[in-house]
Swiss-Prot record:
One of the primary rRNA binding proteins, it binds directly to 16S rRNA central domain where it helps coordinate assembly of the platform of the 30S subunit. This is Small ribosomal subunit protein uS8. Part of the 30S ribosomal subunit. Contacts proteins S5 and S12. The gene is rpsH. GO terms for molecular function: rRNA binding; structural constituent of ribosome.
Amino acid sequence: MPVTDSIADYITRIRNAGRAKNKTTDIPYSKLRENLSQLLVEKGYIKNFTVITTEKFPFLRIDLKYTAHGDPAIKEISRVSKPGRRVYDGKDIKKYLGGLGLYILSSSKGVITDKEARAQGVGGEILFRIY
């Protein structure tokens, strides 16, 4: 069955794998998902990811990160802009949880965080928030 919202699917797979205490999760490949994964690695929310190509289709294998107590590094991850209701913000994007969390945006500069968007003076579509 085709997925209507690939970003929501990406977020849900990561959230469910973290709650189930899985070490890795597999997600169908797309360039956007690869860019999102790279950003989450840079910000320390996931350990690493690899692109695996099979005969049928490529996918991303994401290595999840946990605290010393075994809790997922991602405490909350949720979609903001949805197919039925797109959410955009200008260059003066507010901080999420007073700067403790991040908004992930799709902008003309690519996939960036709210902090990077404020520094570069760009806005865009708020894809999701993470804490």
